[in-house]
Amino acid sequence: MAAAADSPIPSQIKGWVYSEYGKASDVLKLETNVPIPELKEDQVLIKVIAAALNPVDSMRMIGFFKVNDTIPTVPGYDVAGVVVKVGSQVKNFKEGDEVYGDLNEEAHEFPKKVGSLAEYNVAEEKVLALKPKNLSFAEAASLPLAIETAYEGLERVGFSAGKSVLVLGGAGGVGTQIIQLAKHVFGASKIAATSSAGKLDLLKSLGANLPIDYTKVKYEDLPEKFDVVFDAIGEPDRALKAVKEGGQVVTIVAPHPTVPFFVLTSTGTTLEKLRPYFESGKVKPVVDPSGPFPFSQAVEAFSYLDTSRATGKVVIYPIP
């Protein structure tokens, strides 16, 4: 794949574009004449090999962040690919480097008009990291936004060795990474996580001591309470009933009067910090088994993502 760095760089590229707000099946169209993004001095130009979808992509597409958004837009935050050109101030990357990252440093504040669902895009050096050699492009693309969100959330609540955590939505893109980070990086004493019955074995394999079938068990009624509850599905009121006195709840879904809510600040530093865990296999990408979806099936991939039934991440590969 590194040979892509030697290919001529076109002035127009293929990309999935929406020019009005709505769900993907109504507004997302494949275009062949998307202007290639202009490279700034602190950016690299990436030949995209793989991308992953996130709920924030769908939220942007339906117009949830209109005030900070512009259309037409190519969606996509997570990217993995090959550097084909570097800006004059870039220090850590060179042409031919295999990189991955979350393209948007601030998820909701004027995100890039050309996201990862295009043949090429640009990204600031600081949001990228070198792709671990043992990960495929598809696996690498599945990680950045989810694992950076998981890591930042655990750090924000001061999670540390010996503490217990309950993960709401343990089989999702962020949840699968919270479990692994809590176990292998932060040293959790106990990890509970919720999912449907068919995904309980996955939770165990990732490191959960107490997998909970949310269709049968009300986690907030369990006699055991937790030092931290990480809400990745939008149930802060129930989460508050499951946390110990003096413990903390954090949510990534929606602001709440008494629960800390945060929006990820993307940084390649987190990916570099976690590199040893990826390379050792202690922390693994979780790619939904329905995929990867080919580039031509981006609309179908979004439709699947929007069911909220995906396991881990929905990945688009290869691109184009």
Regions found by a protein language model. Name each.
Residues 139-216:
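Mid-domain Rossmann-like dinucleotide-binding core that forms the NAD(H)/NADP(H) cofactor-binding site
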Residues 35-53, 64-106:
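Glycine-rich beta-strand-centered segment in the early N-terminal region that forms part
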Residues 1-22, 320:
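Eukaryotic N-terminal low-complexity, Ser/Thr- and Lys/Arg-rich leader segments
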Residues 102-169:
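NAD(P)H dinucleotide-binding glycine-rich loop of Rossmann-like/cofactor-binding domains
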Residues 93-94, 159, 243:
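Short, well-ordered loop/turn sites that connect or cap secondary structure elements
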Residues 166, 192-195, 201-262, 268:
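Glycine-rich cofactor phosphate-binding loops and adjacent beta1-alpha1 units
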